[in-house]
Amino acid sequence: MRSEVDLTTSALLPCSSMPKTQHFSPDTFKFLKELKRNNDRDWFTANKQRYESAVRDPFLRFIADFAPLLHGISASFTADPRPSGGSLFRIYRDIRFSRDKSPYKTHVAARFPHVDASKDVSAPGFYLHLEPGTSFAAAGVWHPDAQTLTRIRAAIVNRPAEWQSVRRSKMKVEGDRLSRPPRGFDPEHLFIEDLKLKDFVTSVSFSEEQVCRPRFIMDFAASCKKMTPLLRFLAASLELDW
């Protein structure tokens, strides 16, 4: 279950420096709701200008405005506002190997990865997901390759005090999980349930009302800061700078 917290932003910027610009609006979610009901190319083509003005362009501005806030959390992560090849995920689905041939995603999202692994979709990073009824911030690694997963598990075993500190940060670490202990690890280990994880992710939920507030960018930054214990541990596990 994702955390729902009252976030403070005072540690990030003085009040006079807090961005006041509203990035997202009810029109953002209205478009996504309508897209879910009309997920076909003809409808999207007819409404592409709405997508750009209510969804894509506000998100690109958000990414650009978030960059200095992200740098204040860690200079090792990047916010890239380019419309193609940057932080923003494409709205188009890859349907080549999917039974669901719906051409478009019904959510919009961006990733803020570690600069030394920005081309790796499973690299440690922050993430923002906007979807009607399911909006959240997240941090961690999602579906890492076998080598990365082994390095993270080894770090949990070799640095148990640091991992215990992550567990005490009040942010629940979640992900898909093996049904049995991973090969090569003690099935009686204190953190065996964590070692079974195939993803290492923590998250904070937001309502549509929160996302549409002018101060949402600060709330998102504060949620990222709250999730740093896990991300710092993962970066160290993979010998990435913080």
Can you name each region flagged by the protein language model?
Residues 164-228, 234, 238-241:
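Terminal interaction module
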Residues 23-26, 61, 231-234:
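Polybasic/polar functional segments that serve as interface/processing modules
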Residues 130-186:
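Compact, glycine/acidic-enriched structural inserts
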Residues 92-155:
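Aromatic- and glycine-enriched beta-alpha-beta binding-site module
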Residues 12-45, 237-241:
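Short, charged, low-complexity amphipathic alpha-helix
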Residues 3-4, 10:
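Intrinsically disordered, low-complexity segments enriched in serine/proline and basic residues
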Residues 33-91, 225:
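Active-site acidic/histidine clusters and adjacent loop/turn architecture
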Residues 74-104, 108, 174-183:
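A short, surface-exposed loop/turn module that caps and links secondary-structure elements
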